[in-house]
Design a protein with these regions (language model features):
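Chymotrypsin/trypsin-fold serine protease catalytic domain
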Residues: 68-73, 78-81, 110-190, 227-228, ...
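Conserved catalytic-core segment of clan PA serine endopeptidases
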Residues: 6-7, 21, 53-124
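Solvent-exposed loop/turn segments at secondary-structure junctions
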Residues: 21-23, 37, 43-45, 70, ...
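A cross-kingdom C-terminal cell-surface attachment/processing module
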Residues: 296-315
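N-terminal activation segment of mature serine protease catalytic domains
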Residues: 1-22
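Short, small/polar residue-rich loop motifs at catalytic or cofactor-binding pockets
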Residues: 23-26, 193-196
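Juxtamembrane/start-of-transmembrane alpha-helix segments at the extracytoplasmic/lumenal side
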Residues: 285-300
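C-terminal subregion of chymotrypsin/trypsin-like serine protease catalytic domains
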Residues: 15, 26-45, 53-67, 162-175, ...
């Protein structure tokens, strides 16, 4: 909610998740491999009766990418979902607020609110978001850093307007083992209804990465939208993604060379951001030249050990 309308150059890896045949979406997502979208688990399940939850049928979902508005999304930017995989330890009761046992500050927990949507034909006009391993995240991301949330959800709560790609800035507040919290900047802005599953991008000293996925609003604020959020931490779920998707998961580690500013008119809404592309160039470079040695080797090499890491991470 809040924030600013995106431009074509700012679409990056953000996608819209729709019910099949619908003219607009109900959730958002992020492209993490040419044929693979990550989104929130609660966007990819159905609950036919209370307490009975299962993955949505593949034929019931579509994804759209490369567009700024639902009204301008023609058939060329829409793909049918061929397979839906929901995390086997997804806690729907926790996400729906019916049971928050063990929740920490702001409602942070370990509900595994993540699902994968598979497509069979790649998009022509959407980028694959680079990801961070746990070790590189620890090195590059910290409390107080600036991040950007993008999605097709509600951007005007009073009027309930949605269906356009909006971007808002947020401050990383708490980084947990499976989720992270953001706090809003001034003025009000963060995720809202329909942004669920959408990306949280973070600028770092080595480029800009997909850090998390929108899960829900914080539990310690008064507003439903725009006042901080809870995000599924991608680095903690990389072992599950690699195990579930197999060779269909072709992660991108290099941010690349083409810079994409997420800021309106190049302006910097945060006067004193810490490091990253905001500090370097006054813009959030979704694809910027890396510094230091070999981010690609770091990520792709780590994938070889993800099956071993998954056992350790699952015990946290």
């Amino acid at each position: 909610m809040g924030g600013w309308a995106a431009t074509n150059a700012q679409i990056f890896a953000t996608v819209e998740v729709r019910r099949t045949g619908a003219a607009s979406g109900f959730c958002s997502g992020a492209l993490i491999s040419p044929l693979l979208i990550a989104t929130a688990a609660h966007c990819a399940v159905v609950e036919p009766e209370p307490g009975v939850v299962h993955a949505a049928a593949p034929g019931s979902l579509q994804v759209a990418a490369g567009h700024l508005s639902s009204l301008t999304a023609d058939r060329s930017v829409i793909r049918n979902v061929s397979e839906v995989r929901v995390h086997e330890d997804y806690d729907h009761e926790f996400i729906m607020g019916r049971s928050r046992s063990g929740a920490g500050q702001g409602g942070i927990g370990s509900p595994n609110d993540i699902a994968l949507l598979f497509i069979t034909t790649p998009f022509d006009s959407a980028a694959v978001a680079p990801l961070l391993t746990p070790s590189r995240q620890d090195e590059l991301v910290a409390h107080g850093d600036v991040a950007f949330v993008a999605g097709y959800g509600v951007y005007d709560l009073e009027d309930g307007r949605n269906g356009e790609l909006y971007i808002s800035d947020a401050i990383i507040d708490i980084i947990g083992t499976r989720e992270l919290l953001t706090r809003r900047t001034d003025p009000l802005g963060d995720s809202c209804f329909g942004d669920s599953g959408g990306p949280l991008y973070v600028p770092t000293e080595q480029g800009d990465f997909l850090l998390g996925l929108v899960s829900r609003g914080r539990s310690d604020v008064e507003r439903d939208c725009g006042d901080g959020g809870v995000y599924t931490l991608l680095s903690a779920h990389l072992p599950w993604i690699a195990r579930t998707a197999g060779n269909r998961f072709q992660p991108r580690a290099e941010p690349g060379t083409q810079e994409v500013s997420f800021l309106p008119d190049g302006a910097d809404p945060i006067r004193t951001p810490k490091g990253g592309a905001l500090h370097r160039a006054g813009a959030c470079a979704a694809s910027g030249p890396g510094t230091g040695g070999g981010p690609s080797a770091s990520l792709l090499g780590s994938l070889l050990g993800f099956l071993f890491l998954s056992r350790r991470l699952s015990r946290r």
